[in-house]
Amino acid sequence: MYSTTDFRKGLKIEVEGIPYEIVDFQHFKPGKGGAMVRTKLRNILTGRMQDITFRSGEKVNKPDLETRDMQFLYRQDDDLIFMDMTTYEQLQMPVSTTDGKEGFLKDGQECRVLLYKGNPLDIDIPVSMVLAVVETEPGAKGDTVSNVTKPAKLETGLVVQVPIFVNEGDRIKVDTRSKEYLGRE
């Protein structure tokens, strides 16, 4: 159980059987009555935002969340297949729950999977990753100053915009949150 005094950004709580992550919170005292805590919460299951106000000192439950080290095996239609690194148990996760992160998964890659009551919810990947360019238009020699970009297909199938001087076979660093080119490796 958490008290409202334990609230901080990123804390995961359960309200009325639904897991939430605290995005923002503010303690305030109205002119009359006890102190309150106004929170902005993200529903972990749906991603929707919700504002909930708690009385100061009110208790909320900890959600049944668990993080496990897993290995990404392969993609099967609209599902991602992971293997637990300790039990070797395989888990299916719908692509729709990954929020675009599936474009950064390579076969055999290790990552952390967030589970709620045993069901996979989200994957935790690094903020930036180095991936190989497998398909792009040839670049013009010496054109390194202009701000022109072109699409490049990466080894995972993800397509990102890269500067014109990037060629097939180059290894590039990509921001996993914005899917932007960060530099060559």
Swiss-Prot record:
GO cellular component: cytoplasm
CDD domains in alphabetical order: S1_EF-P_repeat_1 (cd04470), S1_EF-P_repeat_2 (cd05794)
PROSITE patterns on file: EFP
GO molecular function, one term: translation elongation factor activity
Example GO biological process: peptide biosynthetic process
Main localisation: cytoplasm
Keywords: Cytoplasm, Elongation factor, Protein biosynthesis
Pathway of action: Protein biosynthesis; polypeptide chain elongation
Protein family according to the UniProt entry: Belongs to the elongation factor P family.
Protein name: Elongation factor P
